[in-house]
Amino acid sequence: MDEINDLAEGLGEPGRAPDEYLDELRTNGFVVVDNVLTSDALERIREATNREIEKQDPAPAEFDDRFGMPHSITWSPDVCRAVTHPVALRIIREYLGTEDIHFCHQPAMTILRPTKELLGTFPDSGWHADYPYHPDVYPEDRWQDENIYGVQYNICIDEFRTDNAATQYVPGSHLVKSFPPRGMNEGGTRMGTPPHENVKQMVAPAGAALIYDSRTWHRACVELNESGEDRLAILNAVCPRWVRPMVDKTNGSTVYFESNAESGLDDLTRVELNHLCHSDTAPLPDGVPTILEKQPMPRRIKI
């Protein structure tokens, strides 16, 4: 894998060679890439996000909630640089087996609130695989394909810990090559107890990136945020560019270009971001599954 030397402002240098992270991702379907963002960049992103939260009317719930702040690439140049980190993207391109990738929704700044009423409860549901491996759009008879059509690229603005609702997942579940069975979403998730006996949490330091195969079974677990504090992360669904976007990205692109946010970016970040977030979907290659159009639906995470 090519060596990457030039890093934009606010980007950290991961502690291992890109090939080592890639090998771990190929082995486990999940890897933590440390030091994607510096502490200064993290603080700027937190401050910018809190300013956006304060503008919301009505104000979002203070507890037991998970929501998104839209258009983060217009109000935080650090988010733009974070989602285009060259080491993370090099790992993803190698894993997907193509240079031509894109984001299937605009980068989603998410805020997971502390729990209160949900503390000690075991909510039903939540277990899923990520786009494009959704049962309403992905053909069931193509789950056994050897090719990989999606990666989740999430950036931890705050540390992911067991006490602040680090994402629950089933290690190795991407190899099952099926959507989570119905029983995973019945009776609540009790880690260590069937059918959730193998469930772990994606623990990682602030500034790290979680990169995992989109077929991985996982869920957000708001009920486990006992920290009393918000936990912030940037979510990205990355696919080969022929995979149709999960949602219509046109409005996000319009808001971005009208904001003139790109004028504050270095050339490499600007070009990469435009390709990932604003390029057209590529023609469908021969032999790949046809991803159906996802029907519009209400979303707590605005993407």
How would you name each of these model-derived features?
Residues 93-102, 143-147, 157-164:
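Secondary-structure boundary elements
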Residues 2-11, 184, 216-303:
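Non-heme Fe(II)/2-oxoglutarate
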Residues 106-108, 153-155, 234-238:
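A structural signal for short, well-ordered beta-strand segments
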Residues 37-39, 109-111, 132, 160-162, ...:
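Short, solvent-exposed loop/turn segments at secondary-structure junctions
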Residues 147-150, 158-221:
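Double-stranded beta-helix
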Residues 123-137, 184-198, 225-228, 249-259:
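Short, surface-exposed loop/helix-turn segments at secondary-structure junctions
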Residues 1-27, 34-141:
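Non-heme Fe(II)-dependent double-stranded beta-helix
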